[in-house]
Structures are given as C-alpha cells and as structure tokens.
Amino acid sequence: ETGESKETGESKETGESKETGESKETGESKETGESKETGESKETGESKETGESKETGESKETGESKETGESKETGESKETGESKETGESKETGESKETGESKETRIYEETKYNKITSEFRETENVKITEESKDREGNKVSGPYENSENSNVTSESEETKKLAEKEENEGEKLGENVNDGASENSEDPKKLTEQEENGTKESSEETKDDKPEENEKKADNKKKKK
C-alpha cells in the first residue's frame, strides 16, 4: 500500500528515509534544510566551511566584503588602505580634504593644548592665593606681598592687644577675689560669734535675776 520497504523504512515515492528524514535525490536533511554536498543552509544561504554568506559575500570571521575588500569594523579599504570616515591614507597620513600632513596637525594641537593648560594653571594659582592666612585674614593676590605683610603685622598687633586685655582682666578678677576673701568671714567664725552672743545674753539674764531678787527683798523689808 505504501510502497515502503521494511528493511530500510524508505519510501519509494519520495525516496526519503524515515530515520534520518534525508532525501536521496538532493541529499538534503529535512530538519536543518542543509545540503550534504555543499554543506550550505537553505535559510541563510551560508556555507559551513567558509562561514561566508551568499547574498552579501561577506565573511563571518573577518566581516570583510568580497566585492569591495572593505572591512566592517574599520571601514578601511584593502587596496588603497584608506579609511572611509576620515578619508585619510595610511601610508602618507595625509587628509584628502585639507591635503595636510598629520605631523603638522599634531604639532598645532599640542601647541594649543599647552597654551590652554598654562593659562589654566595660572588661574588656579590666583584662586589658591586668594585664600586666607593662618590668622584668618583674607589675602587678595599673589602680587600684593607688601599689603599681605602689613595685614600679618596688623594681625600680630591686634593679637598682642587682645592678650594684654585678657591679662588685665585676669588681674582685676584676682583683686576682686582677694577683696571678697578679706571681707567675707568664715562660717565657723560666724557661728562662734553667734554662740558668744547667746552666752552673753544668757549671762545678762542671770544678772537680771539677782537684781529682781534684791528688789523683792527690798519690798519685803519695806512691808515689814
């Protein structure tokens, strides 16, 4: 019915093998659609051995095109050794547009860079020297050394004055303390004085009592 051979499991009509799904006529595999003879894939049209694409004729590994011999990455042509982007030749290092050599251009660039860097440095110096002294006084610029020295000397004078005032203040404070210590009496002394006062008053009261007794005695005598 099927015309299929038992031994090989191969179909007569298609001549296709069951196991491999491979066609006799074309020797092409169903699954991969890859040809035995050329090892070329149907879908991509890409060859196994070279990894080269039919349509573009471009190699995978180098990314280089057959027709132009131009590399993808650098965009540089093999024959002329000329770069697409810059239009600059390898051998001479000369630019198409300007017809100017690299060496001179580089020299100009370095000169320009040098000038700008020097200018920046001097600016920075100015900025740093506009900072403050140790005493916290503002310093205006690098060329005003005389003024700066005056500033420092003034600050020293003010320092000395401040120190003098502090010393005087301390002396005054000491005097005040001395006076206080002289005038102020110790609490022990005060308590002793108070005790003495009470003793004196008690003695007075004792003295008062005999006087009263005497008076009483006089009265009694008078009555008698």
Swiss-Prot record:
Renumbered to this chain, the Low complexity biased-composition regions fall at 144-153
* Transmembrane regions: none
* Key word Repeat present: yes
Q: Could you tell me which residues belong to the region 17 X 6 AA tandem repeats of E-T-G-E-S-K?
A: 1-102
Q: Where is this region: Disordered?
A: 1-224
Q: Note whether Repeat occurs among the keywords.
A: yes
State the sequence repeat positions: 1-6, 7-12, 13-18, 19-24, 25-30, 31-36, 37-42, 43-48, 49-54, 55-60, 61-66, 67-72, 73-78, 79-84, 85-90, 91-96, 97-102
**Which UniProt keywords are present, listed alphabetically?**
Malaria, Repeat
User: Basic and acidic residues bias: where?
Assistant: 1-137, 156-173, 185-217
Q: What else is known?
A: This variable antigen is associated with the surface of erythrocytes infected with mature stages of plasmodium falciparum.
Tell me the protein's name.
Processed variable antigen
